[in-house]
Curated annotation (Swiss-Prot):
GO cellular component: chromatin; nucleus; polytene chromosome; RCAF complex; transcription repressor complex
Described function: Histone chaperone that facilitates histone deposition and histone exchange and removal during nucleosome assembly and disassembly. Cooperates with chromatin assembly factor 1 (CAF-1) to promote replication-dependent chromatin assembly. Plays a role in the formation of silent heterochromatin.
Keywords: Chaperone, Chromatin regulator, Chromosome, Nucleus, Phosphoprotein, Transcription, Transcription regulation
PANTHER family found in the cross-reference section: ANTI-SILENCING PROTEIN 1 (PTHR12040), HISTONE CHAPERONE ASF1 (PTHR12040:SF0)
Cellular localization per UniProt: Nucleus; Chromosome
UniProt-listed GO biological process terms: chromatin organization; DNA replication-dependent chromatin assembly; negative regulation of transcription by RNA polymerase II; regulation of mRNA splicing, via spliceosome
Residue list for modification Phosphoserine: S211, S213
Lineage, uppermost ranks: Eukaryota, Metazoa, Ecdysozoa, Arthropoda, Hexapoda
Top-level taxon in the UniProt lineage: Eukaryota
Listed Gene3D superfamilies: Histone chaperone ASF1-like (2.60.40.1490)
Protein name (database record): Histone chaperone asf1
Species the sequence originates in: Drosophila melanogaster
Amino acid sequence: MAKVHITNVVVLDNPSSFFNPFQFELTFECIEELKEDLEWKMIYVGSAESEEHDQVLDTIYVGPVPEGRHIFVFQADPPDVSKIPEPDAVGVTIVLLTCSYRGQEFVRVGYYVNNDYADPEMRENPPTKPLFEKLTRNILASKPRVTRFKINWDYGHINGNGNGVENGHQDEMATDGPSTSEAASAVIHPEDDNSLAMPMENGIKALNENSNSLAMEC
C-alpha cells in the first residue's frame, strides 16, 4: 500500500507567458512518517519523437516527512529553448510531475501543455523560426493523467520504478515502469490502462474545465 497519496494539484499562473516559471501547488497525504526524503521532479517533454529532448526543470527534496497532510508550491524555470527542436516549439507537449522514495518512482502526473502565439495573425501565419517570447503557455489543468507504480517503501533502494503499476481498477500489474517518453505516450493515448484519465468517477472529483485545480480522493 502506498504511503503517500497526492490529493490535490493546483496549476498556478495559468495561462502564462512561455518564459514565466511553472508553478504547481501540491497537496499530499502521508499515512505514516517517512524517515527519508521524497524526491520531486518536474520534467518538460521537448519532443514526442525522442526522450533525449526531455528537460528536468527542477528537482526538490522534501523530508523527513511526518504523518499527515502537507502542501507546498513546486516552482521551476521554463525549459532551455536551445534544447527544444524547432518543429516542436509550437503546439502541444507535456509536463510531468514525478515523485520518488529511496530512488523508486511511485507516482507521476502528466499535463498537456499548449504553446501558441497570442497574436491571432501570428497563429495564422507563424514565423519560420519560433519566437518564444511571443508564445503563451496554456496547461490543460483539468485533464491530467496519473500513473502509480508499486514500490518497496520499507527496504533499500530498488532500481527502476518498482515492481508494477497501480491504478483505480487494478492494484498490481506485472510490468516495469515506463521511461519518460513512454509515459508521454501514456498521457496522450487514453487507451493506456496503466494511467488514470481524469476527470472520472472512480474516486476522483475534477473541477470545471476552466479550473486550474484538480481534486483527487484517496
